[in-house]
Regions:
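C-terminal compact regulatory domains
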Residues: 1-166
Length: 166
């Protein structure tokens, strides 16, 4: 039921927040505003991802399937998005096809970091992602700390220490 899903999401977000506040995490330098395009067909998953990213001051925009993702990227002003989080299994167009379309679109499409997010942690999946031109591969459920490491290296970000950590 929707209510139960809501409760699960709350629990998931609460646990994720506790994990983050438990150890003095670093945070992104606010001078660098990060905006992601997130291809995700599941409402609950997107809400959780948006909430977790928001804790790091990262904003995102959703595409509910691969086709919408390709279209949004195509229509956007250059440099609108810093990276794309790409769910693998989506209706209409899956993440692999969407990534291939974006890679072939233009110079920015060829360069933008695309991070695969997938429930299947199989080796063959990683190979398919790499063949489609994706830069990294993260399993679901979404581990925000792993994503931060990946974004930090792909986007060449500076971390600043959290001011409130003694």
């Amino acid at each position: 039921s929707m209510h139960r899903k809501g409760v699960e999401a709350e629990k998931y977000i609460k646990e994720a927040k506790e994990k983050i506040s438990a150890k003095p995490e670093k945070k992104f330098n606010k001078l660098k505003r990060i905006h992601l395009l997130v291809a995700e067909d599941n409402d609950l998953n997107y809400e959780v991802e948006q909430e977790l990213l928001g804790m790091y001051g990262i904003t995102c925009e959703r595409a509910a399937n691969g086709e919408i993702c390709v279209d949004k990227f195509h229509r956007a002003e250059p440099k609108t998005y810093d990276a794309i989080l790409m769910d693998m299994q989506m209706p209409v167009m899956d993440g692999i096809d969407a990534a291939k379309h974006i890679r072939q679109m233009d110079a920015e499409g060829a360069e933008i970091p695309i991070i695969a997010v997938t429930a299947n942690a199989f080796k063959s999946d990683e190979e398919h992602c790499a063949e489609a031109g994706m830069n990294a591969h993260l399993p679901k459920p979404f581990d925000i700390n792993k994503l931060m490491e990946v974004l930090t290296s792909l986007l060449d970000l500076e971390y600043t220490e959290n001011e409130n950590v003694q």
